[in-house]
Amino acid sequence: MALNLQDKQAIVAEVNEAAKGALSAVIADSRGVTVDKMTELRKAAREAGVSMRVVRNTLLRRAVEGTAFECLTDTFVGPTLIAFSNEHPGAAARLFKDFAKANDKFEIKGAAFEGKIQNVEFLATLPTYEEAIARLMGTMKEAAAGKLARTLAAYRDKLQEAA
């Protein structure tokens, strides 16, 4: 279906707004994936805080101009499905990676984070906010326990020297 100029401008503006508010983006080719599977992917994306859209490459190039995702323009070849992670930088990458495992025809073309093209594996393995806090707390707890042990050992050594 042909789009008139207003529709094209609306799509570019909508995608541009999504890109400006996103933490990361992932590009994929969904040729050969059934409608049912794509519906499942879209549902999972909504639940994960990921906005997904199939956009014409020329419109997508214009939409990402001046954003952190301009580096992805070389991947805009063939049918392009773009997903923006709004809450966590690794959400879209994790979603697409899991979906690609279950669907052979789904191909991830590229990903961007902080204005640079990134490996999808890197983005998918980024810890969530809760996981990062838990790791930090674990590190702090280990450091505190280690410091306590060293302090007690030093005190013991001091007492032995005095005796």
Swiss-Prot record:
BP terms from Gene Ontology: translation
InterPro entries: Ribosomal_uL10 (IPR001790), Ribosomal_uL10-like_sf (IPR043141), Ribosomal_uL10_bac (IPR022973), Ribosomal_uL10_bac_type (IPR047865), Ribosomal_uL10_CS_bac (IPR002363)
Matching SUPFAM superfamilies: Ribosomal protein L10-like
GO molecular function: large ribosomal subunit rRNA binding; structural constituent of ribosome
Keyword set, alphabetical order: Ribonucleoprotein, Ribosomal protein, RNA-binding, rRNA-binding
GO cellular component terms listed in the entry, alphabetical order: large ribosomal subunit
Pfam families the UniProt entry points to: Ribosomal_L10 (PF00466)
NCBIfam families: PRK00099.1-1
Complexes and interactors: Part of the ribosomal stalk of the 50S ribosomal subunit. The N-terminus interacts with L11 and the large rRNA to form the base of the stalk. The C-terminus forms an elongated spine to which L12 dimers bind in a sequential fashion forming a multimeric L10(L12)X complex.
Function, as annotated: Forms part of the ribosomal stalk, playing a central role in the interaction of the ribosome with GTP-bound translation factors.
Family, similarity comment: Belongs to the universal ribosomal protein uL10 family.
UniProt name for this protein: Large ribosomal subunit protein uL10
Lineage: Bacteria, Pseudomonadati, Pseudomonadota, Gammaproteobacteria, Pasteurellales
